[in-house]
């Protein structure tokens, strides 16, 4: 199944700045890099961020967003000077994949109908037990795709 690419803005880079990835030193990657880490279930995002900081012997790391301890998923971790850029990821669009299990038989038409309600502008309130502040938020869901029922 093909997914449409959502472009928020187009820009070009001046070739006089920076260098090709193959010409960079490893220290450039460590001091200006972002690791897209697959956070396991269990530790907090802050703990995982601290592990990266300790393992790479860095003075500064920062993660882009918070995943609850029981949640798995991509946790972007900015290294050294790249921690400033992590703030941009917090407002960037995200894509989620989930697996649902129903406790009773539900007609496919009902699943598809309810799924459509979660496209467009939605209101979101984090659960009572959550790692983020429990404030009502507005989110835009650009598309939803059911891959298998």
Regions found by a protein language model. Give the residues of each.
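Catalytic/RNA-binding core of pseudouridine synthases
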Residues: 1-149
């Amino acid at each position: 199944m093909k997914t449409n690419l959502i472009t928020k803005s187009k820009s070009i880079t001046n070739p006089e700045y920076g260098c090709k990835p193959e010409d960079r030193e490893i220290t450039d990657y460590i001091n200006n890099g972002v690791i897209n880490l697959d956070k396991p279930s269990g530790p907090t995002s802050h703990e995982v961020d601290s592990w990266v900081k300790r393992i790479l012997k860095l003075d500064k790391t920062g993660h882009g967003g918070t995943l609850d301890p029981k949640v798995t998923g991509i946790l972007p971790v900015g290294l050294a000077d790249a921690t400033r850029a992590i703030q941009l990821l917090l407002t960037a669009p995200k894509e989620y994949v989930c697996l649902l299990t129903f406790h009773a038989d539900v007609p496919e038409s009902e699943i598809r109908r309810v799924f459509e309600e979660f496209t467009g502008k939605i209101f979101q309130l984090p659960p009572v037990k959550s790692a983020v502040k429990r404030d009502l938020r507005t989110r835009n869901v650009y598309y939803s795709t059911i891959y298998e029922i």
